[in-house]
Amino acid sequence: LIRTLMKWTPVALDKPTDYEARAEIMFACTFGCNGILALGMGQSGWPMHGIEHALSAYYDITHGQGLAIIMPHWMRHILCEKTMPRFVKFGVNVLGISPKLPDKEIAEKAISGVSNFFKSLGMPMTLREVGIDDSRLAEMAHHVAVNEGLDNPKNFYPLSEKDILEILKAAL
């Protein structure tokens, strides 16, 4: 899905009337939003959506803006030996990074690649760019911890309230 979005979003932005680009984006979004990708897997492996829900609930920003800001910071925060294989797979299969590179380099290039893609679309990359300061970060982190279930041990990488706050602070 991400590869599809990375291919067709620049086309749609360049030519908004391109039916094929719009159709591909809508088809990818349908799968991204309907939960089918998580069937049989428990919680999503991409919990930055839960973190972003607080951003757009507390502030007037779109889900896409919030994800563009949160995703690279979440990826950096959870990068470790346990998560490395998933980021390597993502980097190789989605971003076309050479599998011959060391795993850590692939993972870091994957994170940079995501960030650079969002930047290329003109998306905001920090909370400050969308008018969010640190005044409510702890409140939002608590809200996410209580309501989103991101600390579930069945999650790919469980996140505590402290983790969520650190991700939000890094995104400033």
Regions found by a protein language model. Give the residues of each.
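C-terminal charged capping/lid subdomain of soluble metabolic enzymes
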Residues: V94-L172
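Active-site segments that bind and position negatively charged phosphate/pyrophosphate groups
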Residues: L1-G113
